[in-house]
A protein has these predicted regions:
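N-terminal accessory segment detector
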Residues: 1-100, 109-110, 114-126, 133, ...
Length: 250
């Protein structure tokens, strides 16, 4: 029998994390890093997000290569690793495909989570470079540029320019590829939250030493207090070799 406890979604067998958990853990790590180390903490969080994003992009590219697909802007749009928790949670799409592909996000579950928990000041650091970092991890020919101020920084919606056009034929191929792949390359947010914890923690400790470890410990304790110890413990069930598959990290 399913059981609901506050912000926790539980069954007797498992705990399933959502975008909210992912968003809040990042913001807690960012807050602790900034409060303990000021500008150095902020710089470390931003570096951590760039590393984290590039790691996601490398996994995506690995999936594309394993299926015989070229590494380009079209396939980058097809090989995403996540989907919303439920219909209507996010609102996003294309603005145009020529002269370059531009996309938008008009409703964001990360922004909603940060606002709910009073963490937007720190959560918005997630948005500074994550989309470009994922893109750069996938390929290194083009840059993803934020056309507008992100919603978390006060903008009306997030808009991105991917630096490369999609022809009508490529856009049709994109729709077909998404349909073909379905959810086969996607990971749940227990996985994504475990990846976030692993990479951001590693970078904070590398950059900030004992203060970085202290920031991580405090943030994880806050996370467990907020969502329950089981929501922290479930992160340990995600194998490191799944987060960092050898074929993507050679």
């Amino acid at each position: 029998m399913d059981e609901q406890k506050g912000d926790r979604v539980m069954t007797k067998e498992t705990v399933c994390l959502r975008i909210e958990h992912h968003a809040v853990l990042f913001a807690l790590l960012a807050r602790q890093a900034v409060e303990l180390c000021g500008e150095k903490g902020k710089e470390s969080i931003l570096r951590g997000m760039t590393v984290y994003g590039k790691e996601r992009g490398r996994r995506m590219a690995c999936n594309a290569r394993k299926r015989g697909d070229e590494i380009n802007t079209m396939t980058n749009q097809a090989y995403g690793e996540w989907k919303p928790d439920f219909d209507g949670q996010m609102e996003f799409g294309q603005i145009h495909t020529q002269p370059t592909l531009q996309t938008y996000i008009a409703k964001c579950a990360w922004c909603d989570a940060w606002e709910k928990h009073g963490l937007t000041e720190y959560g918005r650091l997630y948005c500074v470079n994550v989309d470009n970092a994922v893109y750069q991890g996938y390929q290194d020919k083009y840059v993803c540029t934020q056309v507008t101020e992100p919603m978390s920084w006060g903008g009306p919606r997030c808009e991105f320019d991917w630096g490369c056009p999609l022809t009508p034929e490529e856009n049709e191929a994109l729709a077909a590829k998404k349909k073909e792949l379905g959810a086969s390359c996607m990971k749940d947010f227990t996985f994504h939250t475990a990846h976030l914890r692993a990479t951001i923690s590693r970078i904070l400790i590398e950059d900030l030493g004992d203060d970085g470890q202290r920031a991580v410990d405090r943030a994880l304790a806050e996370f467990a207090e907020l969502f329950g110890q089981e929501c922290l413990d479930v992160l340990d069930t995600v194998p490191e070799e799944e987060i960092y598959p050898k074929e993507a990290f050679v």
